[in-house]
A protein has these predicted regions:
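Conserved catalytic core of the tyrosine transesterase superfamily
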Residues: 1-297
Length: 297
């Protein structure tokens, strides 16, 4: 007696497996990345329901046509005023799901292949400026003896030394820092749960040692740069403290007053200063946590 072929999984079952099994368990993506994928799907499913007149539970893979995807992307830009970067990020989430679905439902390969043909939208990346060494040192400044001043000094030194993203810096715990003179470094936890170790300069080592002497209650699991409640600093607080430091630095470097200095500009400054010092681009890519030197270029 011939065995009956197993029916292909339903669209809702595929979506559930994509989030529960693929993203969370198999790829072990960070909660923030999974949340970005979830938001993209919520928007897409809401758009599909309005356009097709069917609830998400009634959708099938053949419903996910290039026309539907293109209409959704146009809706994001036109009606929701999403940037091209956000539009492409949401398309990437859909493409990731479709590639996953192709392994679970081979009967829909042709449909999926057509849908995967929707291209990302090209856009001009704005040229990002950077600070001179004099300007960067002025922003870092000299701590005035207060707790906040000393913490902010370490924060700004760490941002410049490591070229790290804000999320990586505020996530650093005391135990992530190695202060041995011969092999001083900080272990950063980056995007997609990737980890890397970045060497620490002597000035950074001295500042961290002074900070830890001032804060003996900090243990290996404590945030290196806490707020007054002992919790990790927020992104907003980092932006606020950087803005304050730039205002103070503008007294000695007046040109800073007219510039918007962001943590990402400091990251770019780190890359440019390393490049000017003769460091190879491939090393700078590892320093910044780029997957490819092409990104660093």
């Amino acid at each position: 007696m011939r065995r009956q072929a197993k029916p292909p999984p339903s669209f809702p079952a595929l979506v559930q497996a994509f989030f529960v099994e693929h993203l969370t368990q198999q790829r072990a993506l960070s909660p923030r990345t999974v949340a970005a994928y979830r938001d993209a799907f919520m928007l897409f499913l809401g758009f599909a329901e309005a356009r097709l007149g069917r609830s998400p539970a009634q959708l099938t893979l053949p419903d996910i046509t290039p026309d539907l995807i293109m209409a959704f992307l146009d809706h994001l830009e036109r009606d929701r005023h999403n940037s091209v970067r956000s539009r492409n990020a949401r398309l990437a989430a859909l493409r990731s799901f479709l590639k996953f679905a192709a392994h679970r439902d081979v009967s829909s390969l042709q449909v999926i292949e057509h849908a995967l043909g929707v291209p990302s939208k090209r856009f001009e990346r704005p040229m990002l400026g950077y600070l001179s060494r004099e300007e960067m040192l002025a922003v870092i400044g000299t701590p005035d003896g207060t707790w906040f001043s000393q913490r902010d000094h370490v924060l700004l030194l760490m941002l410049y030394n490591t070229g790290a993203r804000v999320s990586e810096i505020v996530g650093v715990k005391v135990g992530d820092v190695v202060l041995d003179d011969a092999a001083a470094c900080v272990h950063l936890h980056g995007k997609g749960r990737k980890q890397r170790s970045v060497p620490l300069w002597r000035s950074t080592i001295r500042a961290i040692r002074a900070w830890l002497r001032r804060n003996p209650p900090l243990d290996s699991n404590s945030p290196l740069l806490p707020n007054r409640d002992g919790q990790a600093m927020s992104r907003w607080t980092v932006m606020q403290r950087l803005e304050r430091a730039v205002q103070a630095a503008a007294k000695s470097c007046p040109d800073l007053a007219a510039r918007h200095i962001s943590p990402h500009m400091i990251r770019h400054t780190t890359a440019m200063h390393l490049l000017q010092a003769g460091v190879d681009v491939s090393i700078i890519a590892l320093w910044l946590g780029h997957e490819s030197p092409a990104t660093t270029h």
